[in-house]
């Protein structure tokens, strides 16, 4: 994967536009989770330190395109950046016809989704973004799978289009885990539905030495082995697909689980074998024997890819399976990469972020990369590197 890297360029005096992923949760005008901004700070700081005229932009939320809406303004992000950076920071609302930026100053360009044509990768809008800068830096891995004006179109028309350190790091880490993984390679795919992750399961079954399934996905595999899953979330129409995967890949299906009579935070957990599940019960977590068996597999792994929890970890009574898995990954010597919103929430909950080799900021982009799909923004950067 050959792209121009921002870190290889001299940015002094240049107008630099960074497309970051600053799509953070905001409540009452305050940023409530700063993980994505923190991840973007090093890129901004490198450009400022080099004496560039720095602009950064992002989308935030899902406003009606082409309309300004204060609820989706990047102003809370600007307030956050003012606290973290020693350089002056300001918000520019009207910038499409040009914006003055001083050396060593950071100008945040208001939410790109307020611009008509953003989502459709409009050429006129893309050219306006490109005219703002000498160097366009794509650093938002989380939106690299979308061909939009601020992630894709702008890069086609900018004088120079390059990958920022965050995007480069994501691509290198995923490449390391998927292209030439140290073996054994173990992949964990959790979540509620097989249907949404069937392509991922299929792709990983060809790469991984062992494929661990969890959550509602695992219930479909339990059912595929002929067990009653009661009222559990599962997909009867995908049992044949699950059987196919069981034949082609080593998938350790749970032998014991934690069940409840209702889907509720206060529901009592009962530990039982998968052969004993009653019609009125639903599986909400792995059992101890299954979780410890998986922990042992992870202990011996050399590469671990983790996407999705293995139980309803948001409920304290059904957290144990995910915690055992999370701690096994943290204790492993393997190169580990984790991605997806729920996975990141679990990592935060168990306080193991510093024990994971690489935490991906992308949800959909992470999955599409794992599926082997080409990400439009990355393809654009590769094409620009050839010119």
Curated annotation (Swiss-Prot):
EC number(s) given by UniProt: 2.7.2.3
GO terms classed as biological process: gluconeogenesis; glycolytic process
Record localization: Cytoplasm
GO cellular component, one term: cytosol
Protein residues bound to ATP: 197, 314, 340-343
InterPro entries: Phosphoglycerate_kinase (IPR001576), Phosphoglycerate_kinase_CS (IPR015911), Phosphoglycerate_kinase_N (IPR015824), Phosphoglycerate_kinase_sf (IPR036043)
Gene Ontology molecular function: any one: ATP binding
Reaction(s) the record says it catalyses: (2R)-3-phosphoglycerate + ATP = (2R)-3-phospho-glyceroyl phosphate + ADP
Annotated binding of substrate, by residue: 21-23, 36, 59-62, 113, 146
Pathways per UniProt: Carbohydrate degradation; glycolysis; pyruvate from D-glyceraldehyde 3-phosphate: step 2/5
Major location (coarse): cytoplasm
Self-association state and partner proteins as the record states: Monomer.
HAMAP family documented for this protein: Phosphoglyc_kinase (MF_00145)
Entry's family note: Belongs to the phosphoglycerate kinase family.
Official protein name in the record: Phosphoglycerate kinase
UniProt organism field: Pectobacterium atrosepticum (strain SCRI 1043 / ATCC BAA-672) (Erwinia carotovora subsp. atroseptica)
Gene name as annotated: pgk
